């Protein structure tokens, strides 16, 4: 009886020990660092796209005096037309709050750009994202085009799908046909969403590289593993504006 009770106790104890799951996406470095990136999408009235961009170009210095602009693009393929997409960097949430308060008090910004241009915008969207710990923001070597690939992953978080996703990204990087700019994990917005920002010399070089990658067994194997955790995905071709820091 004692032996049976002892064996049962050990069995129950082993079942209560939760397995430790580690992931290279896991929360930690990105939260400790505090730095995050705000993704903003402005859907503009079709007849007002050029006017809006010209107005921002003339007044961009008023906005960038308050916080860092990472990049500013127009959507060419894969998304709603007449859309501009931009990324802003903040040290932490307190920093963003300070910036928003300062902008609200900046009469020059309000009067020269914001108020006159609000009527040109149909809709605005915002997401807060962190760079994943294994990726730092990279600047491309020259001007080109950008691809924003967005992946909606299954619930469970990076501990479930992070490592497989990392291997899939690196499989493409290792082929050398494209340059990885950054991998971002959404904190506010749709959860379990990952954005991968790529740079290519042109849309045609990107197409040729993708064709090559689809025939590479290393890429095929890594992607096949990652899609087990995928719900949906979308990609957009982005054209940098003349005033975008990332060209």
From Swiss-Prot:
Q: Which residues carry this modification: N6-acetyllysine?
A: 48, 166
A Pfam family per the record:
NIPSNAP
Instruction: Name the keywords, alphabetized.
Output: Acetylation, Cytoplasm
Q: Subcellular localization, per the record?
A: Cytoplasm, Cytosol
Q: Which domain of life is it from?
A: Eukaryota
- BP terms from Gene Ontology: mitophagy
Main location class:
cytoplasm
Entry-linked InterPro entries: Dimeric_a/b-barrel (IPR011008), NIPSNAP (IPR012577), NipSnap_domain (IPR051557)
Gene Ontology CC annotations of this record: cytosol; mitochondrion
Family that this chain belongs to: Belongs to the NipSnap family.
- Name the UniProt record assigns to this protein: Protein NipSnap homolog 3A
Species of the source: Pongo abelii (Sumatran orangutan)
């Amino acid at each position: 009886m004692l032996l049976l009770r002892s064996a049962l106790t050990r069995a129950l104890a082993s079942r209560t020990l939760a397995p430790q799951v580690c992931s290279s996406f896991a929360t930690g470095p990105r939260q400790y660092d505090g730095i995050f990136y705000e993704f903003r999408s402005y859907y503009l009235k079709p007849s007002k796209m050029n006017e809006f961009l010209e107005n921002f170009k003339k007044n961009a210095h008023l906005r960038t005096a308050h916080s860092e602009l990472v990049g500013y693009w127009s959507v060419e393929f894969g998304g709603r037309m007449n859309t501009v997409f931009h990324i802003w960097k903040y040290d932490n949430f307190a920093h963003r709050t300070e910036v928003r308060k300062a902008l609200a008090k900046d009469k020059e910004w309000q009067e020269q750009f914001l108020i006159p241009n609000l009527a040109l915008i149909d809709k605005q969207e915002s997401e807060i994202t962190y760079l994943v710990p294994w990726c730092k923001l990279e600047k491309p070597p020259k001007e080109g085009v950008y691809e924003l690939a967005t992946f909606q992953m299954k619930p469970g978080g990076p501990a479930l799908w992070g490592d497989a996703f990392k291997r899939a990204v690196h499989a493409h990087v290792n082929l050398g046909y494209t340059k990885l700019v950054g991998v971002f994990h959404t904190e506010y917005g749709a959860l379990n969403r990952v954005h991968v920002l790529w740079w290519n010399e042109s849309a045609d070089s990107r197409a040729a590289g993708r064709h090559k990658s689809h025939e590479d067994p290393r890429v095929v194997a890594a992607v096949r593993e990652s899609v087990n955790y995928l719900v949906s995905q979308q990609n957009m071709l982005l054209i940098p504006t003349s005033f975008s820091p990332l060209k």
